[in-house]
Amino acid sequence: MEKKMAGFCIFFLVLFLAQEYGVEGKVCLNLSDKFKGPCLGTKNCDHHCRDIEHLLSGVCRDDFRCWCNRNC
């Protein structure tokens, strides 16, 4: 009886952990096509990429350009 209960608990533990560690798609970083001017604030770049270009997110990099993350 104890072996069945232990097996039952292990089964649900594995099932729970499998849900927590889902597979994520690959993300690519692309230069924004529509962002104008130097990228000085990541918040503005992120807003632009999400709301205007409908991508995942955006970030300013060392070259003062806005780079957007998208699914590959």
Swiss-Prot record:
Residues 1-25 form the signal peptide. The keyword Disulfide bond applies. Disulfide bonds join C28-C72, C39-C60, C45-C66. Not glycosylated. Keywords: Allergen, Antimicrobial, Defensin, Disulfide bond, Fungicide, Signal. SMART domains: Knot1 (SM00505). GO terms for biological process: defense response to fungus; killing of cells of another organism. May form dimers. Probably has antifungal activity. Belongs to the DEFL family. This is Defensin 3.
